[in-house]
């Protein structure tokens, strides 16, 4: 799911689609309009799921896509090596996600955790 917004409405910490990948905006620089052109914006963003740094250069009045990112809660049913079986607390559906290396000690069976869902992808997110 995604929606279209103008580049001038984007802010740091919000989300944007760069190369069809949902990203968190880290910085935005806007240049002033010149004699023969409109103002431009340079957006630096980091992918939510892959961690890659991406940059977008676009006119401030142009439209871009913003992903709809949902934070949901789930309960850990079981853990086998680096894969956790989770149950969504609202819909009670079960699914499996890989546990990131830095969260391995914090994800235990029976515990409630938060996960991110955007553009058909999911990721465990413990903040």
Curated annotation (Swiss-Prot):
Instruction: Give compartment(s).
Output: Cytoplasm
* Modified residue annotations for Hypusine: 35
Task: Enumerate the Gene Ontology biological process terms.
Answer: positive regulation of translational elongation; positive regulation of translational termination
Entry annotated with the keyword Cytoplasm: yes
Under Gene3D superfamilies, the record lists:
2.30.30.30, Nucleic acid-binding proteins
Q: Name one Pfam family in it.
A: IF5A-like_N
An example molecular function term from Gene Ontology annotations: ribosome binding
**Keyword annotations of the record:** Cytoplasm, Hypusine, Initiation factor, Protein biosynthesis
Give any Gene Ontology cellular component: cytoplasm
The keyword Cytoplasm appears for this protein: yes
SMART domains the record matches: eIF-5a
Chain's role: Functions by promoting the formation of the first peptide bond.
UniProt lists the family membership as follows: Belongs to the eIF-5A family.
Q: Know the name of this protein?
A: Translation initiation factor 5A
Q: Which species is this record about?
A: Methanococcoides burtonii (strain DSM 6242 / NBRC 107633 / OCM 468 / ACE-M)
